Curated annotation (Swiss-Prot):
Involved in bacillithiol (BSH) biosynthesis. May catalyze the last step of the pathway, the addition of cysteine to glucosamine malate (GlcN-Mal) to generate BSH. It comes from the Bacteria. GO terms for molecular function: ligase activity. Residues 458-479 form a coiled coil. The keyword Ligase applies. HAMAP family: BshC. Belongs to the BshC family. Its EC number is 6.-.-.-. The keyword Ligase applies. It comes from Geobacillus sp. (strain WCH70). NCBIfam families: thiol_BshC (TIGR03998). This is Putative cysteine ligase BshC.
Length: 542
């Protein structure tokens, strides 16, 4: 594998400016990416903090035993008992088969940064992945994209409940899921890895009752030798550890909301669009009734917390009592999840995607309410994999990969096609249509002088003539495409691989396509690459 770095804008302007060093750091973050001592400073800032280390380790031991996690993972869990140990954390929803590639890249980023900083700082650093099991947006995680008959298809897991159930509580039907997996892997083609891959996935499925179980089982096996630790944010035993901070979030709900709204206003004044949809009445917590999450709002007149349509109503004391006795009924939203993470974990760094970078900037003042400093926010690695066959296609059609990323592939294809004939078709047909119109116009005028009632017929006749020219143009264009079908297919293959659906590769394709084709050591090779935390896009040639 070879790596080439290129500069590409992030998907949000704020993330682009943050990565490039042009965002005013103090306006949205506590640490600068450009500071060489950023991790030493962070280590110093959190060394006096108290964390629920023993409770967390007991929970993590129990959770990982369910998945028969590796000895390396249990070794890393025990590290958390060390008073100076810290974590590098990143998180994502529990996509089926791990979802798009960027989830895998985020895990790789967490692992690589943890190893690097353990070596540099001389303290234990644990790679931890926060699974957003409390999320209820099933449509985000219930599918995988596949390539079939030259087209991109969204292949959806069919057995989904209708309620807004937390992903961690969405059950998997093993028979339905086995068929779903088999059909996906079939589209990858038969290789010497295929049977091993199916066995791997079915073993993970056997350990799993829910979407989150399946995700956790897969990533713990894929990264077993790296000692990855995972945390299911929706797990009831974890909620017991979070109980006291839920109480703090209830007590300070208004201050949190006001802090976010103020920060959003400041960022708008700097020219950045807000990412979070938050209103003054938001309580930033959900109530979970066991089947559905209900976002809570606060009514200052009645001094109650309630779901939008009043299905559930709580006084402040009732909600605090719930946090103390039944914390499993409470769930964080996008604002309070990072705060809960900071309460739980001695976080050296948070590995983030571009969207997360943008919305975390809106949370800086919310962190300070609880005496926290936002951890260093480190952009995850962005990767595009270029297979050897795609590299060959690019060379043969004479296209630079930047043309693909800049959305110029279709334009390049049309230019290439135009160069294959000595006749400039577009110009010829445009000229023909103009000349026919010039000839026909005086005929229409003459007809109108004879009988103005012929206006409709004369116009229709002109339209038919132009339509015939268009028909001939399209016929010749199709013939040209047929003649160069082999060459044009190369453009399609390049687009399908590198920018499917005009989206970055890492947002569409799944890691198991590549594992099926190149073997399980494909992931090990990705892990062995030297990644620089500079925000540059990595093109990996294989």
């Amino acid at each position: 594998m070879e790596v080439r770095e290129i500069s590409l804008a992030a998907t949000t302007p704020l993330a682009t400016d943050y990565i490039n060093g042009t965002f005013p750091i103090e306006k949205g973050f506590s640490y600068s990416l450009q500071a060489e001592d950023v991790f030493w400073r962070r280590l110093d800032d959190i060394k006096g903090r108290a964390y629920p280390r023993r409770e967390l380790v007991e929970y993590l031991r129990s959770y990982h035993q369910r998945f028969h996690a590796s000895s390396e993972t249990f070794y890393n869990i025990e590290k958390l008992l060390h008073p100076e140990s810290v974590v590098v954390v990143g998180g994502q929803q529990a996509g089926l088969l791990t979802g798009p590639l960027y989830t895998i890249y985020k895990i790789i980023s967490v692992i690589k940064l943890a190893k690097e900083q353990e070596r540099k700082l001389g303290v234990p650093v644990v790679p931890l992945f926060w699974i957003a099991g409390e999320d209820h947006d099933i449509a985000e995680v219930n599918h995988v994209y596949i390539a079939e008959d030259g087209k991109i298809k969204k292949y959806v897991y069919p057995d989904i409940p209708q309620e807004k159930r937390m992903v961690s509580d969405v059950p998997l039907d093993h028979q339905v899921c086995s068929t779903w997996i088999t059909n996906i892997v079939k589209t990858y083609g038969e290789t010497e890895t295929t049977n091993k891959l199916l066995d791997f996935l079915f073993q993970c499925l056997d350990q799993s009752k829910t979407f989150v179980d399946f995700f956790a089982s897969i990533v713990l096996r894929l990264f077993a030798s790296e000692g990855l630790v995972v945390l299911n944010a929706a797990d009831v035993p974890l909620r017991a550890i979070e109980s006291s901070f839920f109480t703090a979030l209830i007590e300070c709900h208004r201050e949190v909301t006001d802090a976010v709204l103020r920060k959003q206003h400041q960022l708008r004044q700097l020219g950045y669009k807000n990412t979070l949809d938050i209103q003054p009445h938001c309580a930033n917590l959900f109530y979970y009734d066991g089947r559905q999450r209900w976002l809570l709002e606060h009514d200052p007149q009645k001094e109650v917390f309630h779901s939008k349509k009043g299905e559930f109503v709580f006084s402040k004391d009732e909600l605090i009592q719930l946090a103390k006795t039944k914390p499993g009924h409470l769930s964080n939203n996008v604002v309070t999840r990072p705060l809960m993470q900071e309460f739980l974990l001695p976080t050296l760094a948070f590995v983030a995607g571009p969207g997360e970078i943008a919305y975390w900037a809106e949370l800086k003042e919310a962190f300070s309410i609880f005496g926290f400093k936002m951890p260093p926010v480190i952009p995850r690695v962005n990767i595009t994999i270029v297979e050897r066959s795609i590299q060959t296609d690019l060379a043969e059609i004479g296209i630079d990969i930047m043309d693909v990323f800049k959305g110029r592939l279709e334009e390049a294809k049309q230019q290439w096609l135009a160069q294959q004939t000595r006749y400039p078709l577009e110009e010829m047909f445009a000229k023909a249509k103009a000349e026919i119109e010039e000839i026909h116009r005086p005929l229409r005028e003459f007809g109108m002088e004879i009988d103005r009632g012929l206006a409709g017929l004369l116009t229709k006749n002109a339209t038919l003539l132009q339509a015939q020219i268009d028909f001939l143009h399209q016929t010749l264009q199709r013939a040209l495409i047929r003649k160069y079908e082999v060459e044009l297919r190369k453009f399609s293959r390049v687009e399908m691989s590198l920018m499917p659906n005009q989206a970055p590769q890492e947002r569409i394709w799944n890691i198991f396509y590549y594992i099926n084709k190149y073997g399980f050591d494909f992931l090990e090779k990705l892990l062995q690459l030297d990644y620089k935390w500079n925000g540059m896009h990595k093109i990996v040639y294989i």
